[in-house]
Amino acid sequence: LVHATALGIYDLHLNGERVTGNYFAPGWTDYRRSVYYNSYDVTSRLQEGSNCLGAVVADGWYSGYLPSGKAKGYGPYRTGRNMYGKNPAFLAQLHIEYEDGTSQIVLTDSSWKVTTGPETAADLLAGEQYDARKELAGWSTPGYDASKWNDAIPATKSKGLNPPFSDKTGTRAT
């Protein structure tokens, strides 16, 4: 089971496959009060040996343009952007239970690697800009060489996370 959230929006990948079944995860929230997370059962996607978990993270509601934001002068510079913050962030916990009864939790931390990919801009209102020349083939597969990527910078802890987000059909995102 993997639990994931973002200050912004994310698209979760495991072993080269997209895990996230919805767009704009984890969903809108007033980031000053709460942050939702989603839980995904990835049991069938885990493989023996090495696995690779990663995410594409974008501004979303956290630091992107908000509806009517520019017209109403929202945000620190009255541009309609950065209403809640400037830098998107991602958090994940992968819970693994082995057949012998032992378990392991893999957390996002400074051992994770980050880079800029082909999505050079991704905003809910301004749209996405995609530069295919910057594609990173195989970036979420085991053995990918990310040695030229930067180390992730851990975000400061918040007061806590809310219960899992449910989509509009009332089902838990799994």
Language model feature labels by segment:
Residues 152-174:
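Edge strands and adjacent loops of beta-rich recognition modules
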Residues 137-140, 153-154:
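Long, well-ordered, tryptophan-enriched scaffold segments
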Residues 1-135:
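Accessory beta-strand-rich segments of carbohydrate-active enzymes
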Residues 4, 150-151:
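Generic detector of well-ordered secondary structure
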